[in-house]
Structures are given as structure tokens and as C-alpha cells.
């Protein structure tokens, strides 16, 4: 039995594994770009299949493709979407910057599979042509940007945003639950005036709410599709109604608000929509890193740290120190946030580096974008499930630190003035006294006045979180 078959493209014949659906151009890419291990993301492959499916339907409706061929292409695309042919898409991220080889990989797989569905022999009887039929009314230059936007928008809507909302809700519930717990605040890693634990967590909630708004603001641009621009944005070789119809078809089959890009030149020449959307993801990463750092600092200890909150103990933390448990969810979240920030630099460079009518950094851009979405979505889910939901206050420790803080002296500013209040704090710190003892020793106020004026619960403003 032959292990290879001969496939042809415009450069001639080349041997292809006999059991594979791909053709000559895919094989050439495999042989010429043996670079690292990163492959085109499955979600991007499926977005390409969705794009080809929609194009086949619209080309049929416009009388440009026979019903027989269009139906076979759609059936083949549905098989790809069902995961039946995942191993037919082996190409590296590090290929042509337009994604042409991955577009042709999809064209060849769908053409060979559609030909089989129409009774042809794999690679022998080409009843459906990869360029003339599967790629009809298209160019890699508008197909690949379209697939990028489809994959990105679906990932944001289905993966990231739900997890962001869930984590925000969890922290909002914690903020309300801890609204009456007065604790010491900290600025510059030094003691500051009091606030409630609920107020502190409300800041985290507001950060995430703003992040959601920024991400949602970026979505309409991502929903604009380049399809119909063909090679340079002019729409050469397309029907006048094709661009609008194919965007409408993609909107229907994905249940997402896709529209045809109003300016195809921008859609082909730039990656601005993804640069801007990833900027919002970078902002989310910055917020999550701050939250995770705050959580692990507040939970530090158990005996020699801050220890104001407890977090779930999920696994042993040391191979040498018995009983040690570490804030592993916080550490995982901070690491992936660093990766997202690095991805943002690469995406910015790629987005800024397109020349004239086409950006040619697209595979790298979408690889990093989808990785960031997956990291953030999975990271938030894990952090929420294994850490955030289990945050609990250590009231005894909170009260101990609150009552030992010298910064409660700030409450005296309006009664005895800043200079005398500072003198009290310095004396207490230098001599190891309580604030009350130092104040009485200096004779600046009576015991009754101190007890009336220095009341932490009255120093937090409204007890409502967010005040």
C-alpha cells in the first residue's frame, strides 16, 4: 500500500502522506517551516472553517457556486468544526505573516474532503477545487484577518467575559460580607488610616468592573470583518453583495454581532482592533496581578506575616518544610499576568509593523491574543474556585494590628493639630507606648478626650463599600 500520493499546485508535484487530506501547499509549508512546536490554535482553525462555510453558502446564494459543491464544502467544514479532522492542520505559527499557508491548508482539506463526499478518491479525483471553489470570492489577505476576528470575538464572549463576571461577583459578595470589619489601611507598605475589609475589596471589584467595560468597548471593532476586501481591500473578483452577506451569514451561524468592515483597507492593513482589544486584556492582567498580590500579602503568615485573611489550603507547599502551605493560586495568576503583558508587547510590535496594504504579523498576533484570553479565563476560573470563594477574615489578628497602629493618631489632627499628633506618634513608637499613654504623658488631652476622638470605626467614612 502506498504511503504517499502526489499532489500538485502551481509549483508542480509533491508527495503528500496518503492518509492525509491536505495537499501540496500544506506539505510545502510543513517542509519549509519546521520551527518550534507552536501550531495554529484549534479555535483559529475552527474560525477558518466557519469562514469557509459562510462563504460557500453566500457563493451558492449568489449563483457563483453550484448547490452540490457548496453543500459538500459546508458538510466538510462541519466535520472540521466537530473536531473530526483536527490532525489535518499541522502548520506552525511561524510561517508566512499573512496566514496564507493556513488558509490553503483549510482550502485543501475541505476540497479533498468535499470531493470524497461527492464520490471522488482522496487526492485523485478533484471534484472540488481548493482555490476555484473553496476559496471563491476570497483571498488569504481577507480570509485570515476574518478568521482572526471570529476566533477572538468568540473567545472573549464565551471564555473570558463569563469568568470575569463570575470573579467580580464573588469578590462583590465578599465585600458586602466584610463591610463591618474595620482594619488598618496600608500605603507605601506602611501603616495608614483605617478602612473596612469590605471597602478594601470593593476597590478590587471596581477594578474588574472597569476592566469589563474596557473589554466590551473593544468588541465592536473586533466584530468588523475583512472578508470581501480580497487582495488589497478593493474587493476584486467579488460580487457587490458578497461582503455584507457573508458577514451576515457568520453572524447567524455564530450568534455573534459580526458586520462587514466599513473600510476594508484598514481591515487588511492593520491589526488595530486586536491591538486595542489586547490592550484591555493587558489592563485586566494588571488588575488581577494587583489583586492576587494583595491577597497573598494579606494572607501571609501564618504566624509571622500580616495574616488578616485566610485563604484555602489546597496542597502541600514545600518538599522540605513540613506543614508549609503556599498561596499557589495567587502565584499562578501573577505568572500568567506577566505572560499576558509580554504578549501585549509582541502584539503591539506586530500591529505596528505592517507595511502598505497588508499586515504580515498575523499568525503571531492571533496566537498571542488567543493565548492571553485562555490564560486569563482559565486563571480567573481557577483563582475564583480555589481561592477567592474561600477568603475569610481573621478578626482577632485584624483587631490586634488595628489597635497597635500608630496611624490612629490621625484622628487627633483636627483636635490638637498635626504637629502635636505627630509628637504623640513618635513618642509612642520610640518608647514602645500605646498612643493613649503617649498622649497622656505629653498632656495634650485627657483620657476621656482620647477615647472619644480616637475611634477607628468612625474613621472609615461610610461603612458602605466603595465610599
UniProtKB/Swiss-Prot annotation:
It holds the Pfam family FumaraseC_C. SUPFAM superfamilies: L-aspartase-like (SSF48557). Pathway: Carbohydrate metabolism; tricarboxylic acid cycle; (S)-malate from fumarate: step 1/1. InterPro entries: Fum_hydII, Fumarase/histidase_N, Fumarase_C_C, Fumarate_lyase_CS, Fumarate_lyase_fam, Fumarate_lyase_N, L-Aspartase-like. It catalyses: (S)-malate = fumarate + H2O. Its main location: cytoplasm. The record marks 331 as: Important for catalytic activity. Its EC number is 4.2.1.2. It is an enzyme of class 4 (lyase). The active site is at residues 188, 318. GO terms for biological process: fumarate metabolic process; malate metabolic process; tricarboxylic acid cycle. Homotetramer. Belongs to the class-II fumarase/aspartase family. Fumarase subfamily. Involved in the TCA cycle. Catalyzes the stereospecific interconversion of fumarate to L-malate. This is Fumarate hydratase class II. It comes from Escherichia coli O157:H7. The lineage of its organism: Bacteria, Pseudomonadati, Pseudomonadota, Gammaproteobacteria, Enterobacterales.
